[in-house]
Amino acid sequence: MHDANIKRYCADSVQLWTGGSRGLLTRESASRVKVITENHISSQRQGYICSDNIHVPHDNPFDVAKRHIGSGKTAVVHFLDPKDISGGCMAGRASRQAVMCARSNMYPCMDSAKVREGFVTYSKYQFHSYDSDRLVYIPAVAVY
């Protein structure tokens, strides 16, 4: 995606994912967003069986996820910049995170008080903003 088009594309994407029937999907996903704090142990951890199906491909994460979606639960792990959760998308900067935000409802799902307080603000007051082990869990991200 060309840098000059990113800002316009991101703004269009946010409009697309926050209105109409897609807006309902985004609000449902956003209502389930969780900020997971340090030392968190999931109550669902017991009985988990890892089948070692971990892939680290050199490709767009959403394209890879689409290829694997039929084989069970699929997750995309992506490191967020706590200073700008859109990855610069809304400012027109090109980055992997910006493209992911432009192609999905990820940014509207993260653009909430819960994420700003539990992830962005918390990270801001660390010695270095990347010292946090917190993560943002967004179930059912919709991608186009």
Task: Describe the predicted segments one by one.
Residues 1-144:
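Macrodomain-like recognition of ADP-ribose-binding/processing modules
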